[in-house]
């Protein structure tokens, strides 16, 4: 119960899904958790649930792609706790893009603004605080599609960029005792996944879950908690010699040839879903 006791951890996109699971686990293991999200209602709910379980947490609204909002939120966290050790860059968007000759520039810009620029901005404003109280750990939540390809080019490219940025930062900040690692989830059943499944699978969410389960070596989809435990390891001192690496948590999915199931023809040029699930 004390794997990150006494540490202060920021979790972006912490109001739902992987971020929520991570925030709750870090709090359970002794960290004071700072949640950043654009979803105020669920962000405050997660804080309330953490406190009800005798944990410590606070929430600040911020769009990670907007520098002033990130700066303000991180200053508020440091003002309250007076220290900072862990940053989990989890906030992200899933926007398709479609074939290059049909894709729209504004969609490309949105994906990279949140998935890449957002992680950079959070790192920019967390590092000075971590340097004061370190050592520290930054965990960037990427995707298996930052390693292998799908047909969602903008998303894949953004996660590949975040993976590369992680490695660069791992080198830059190693002597400052701040470790950087990336975590690469496979198919995880989250509110965001369910929203996408409703859009692309004519037979519904249940069918999508079933097909992604039977095409996985472990015969199931992942849960937010599966990823949260990986993040906990990378955030804790247990991984003090782990730096600049990728942790894939996908049930073995990318270790075998892909099994693709038929849904319908997806027009990725119009498909658009943001951080806040319905």
Where are these regions (language model features)?
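Canonical Rossmann dinucleotide-binding motif of NAD(H)/NADP(H)-dependent dehydrogenases/reductases
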Residues: 2-34
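Short C-terminal tail/terminal secondary-structure segment
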Residues: 97, 243-278
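Substrate-binding pocket helix/loop in short-chain dehydrogenase/reductase
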Residues: 98-100, 104-109, 212
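C-terminal substrate-recognition "lid" of short-chain dehydrogenase/reductases
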Residues: 120, 218-249, 254
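Active-site helix of classical SDR
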Residues: 123, 158, 166
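Residue(s) in the substrate-gating loop at a strand-loop-helix junction
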Residues: 143
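Short, small/polar-rich loop/turn modules that mediate ligand/substrate recognition or access, typified
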Residues: 174, 179, 242-244
């Amino acid at each position: 119960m004390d794997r990150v006791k006494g540490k202060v951890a920021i979790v972006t996109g912490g109001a739902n899904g992987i971020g929520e699971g991570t925030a709750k686990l870090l709090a359970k293991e002794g960290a004071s958790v700072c949640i950043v999200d654009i979803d105020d209602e669920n962000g405050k709910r997660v804080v309330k649930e953490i406190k009800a379980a005798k944990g410590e947490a606070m929430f600040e609204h911020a769009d990670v792609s907007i520098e002033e909002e990130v700066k303000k939120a991180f200053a508020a966290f440091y003002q309250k706790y007076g220290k900072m050790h862990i940053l989990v860059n989890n906030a992200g968007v899933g926007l398709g893009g479609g074939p290059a000759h049909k894709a729209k520039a504004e969609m490309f810009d949105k994906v990279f603004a949140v998935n890449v620029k957002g992680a950079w901005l959070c790192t920019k404003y967390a590092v000075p605080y971590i340097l004061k109280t370190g050592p520290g750990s930054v965990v960037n939540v990427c995707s298996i599609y930052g390693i292998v390809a799908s047909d969602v080019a903008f998303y894949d490219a953004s996660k590949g960029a975040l993976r590369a940025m992680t490695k660069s930062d791992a080198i830059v900040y190693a002597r400052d005792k701040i470790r950087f690692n990336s975590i690469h989830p496979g198919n995880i059943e989250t509110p965001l996944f369910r929203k996408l499944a409703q859009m692309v699978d004519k037979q519904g969410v249940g069918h999508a879950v079933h097909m992604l389960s039977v095409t996985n070596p472990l015969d199931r989809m992942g849960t937010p908690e599966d990823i949260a435990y990986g993040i906990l390891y990378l955030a804790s001192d247990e991984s003090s010699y782990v730096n600049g690496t990728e942790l894939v948590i996908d049930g073995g999915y990318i270790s075998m040839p892909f099994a693709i199931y038929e849904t319908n023809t997806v027009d990725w040029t119009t498909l658009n879903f943001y951080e806040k699930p319905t």
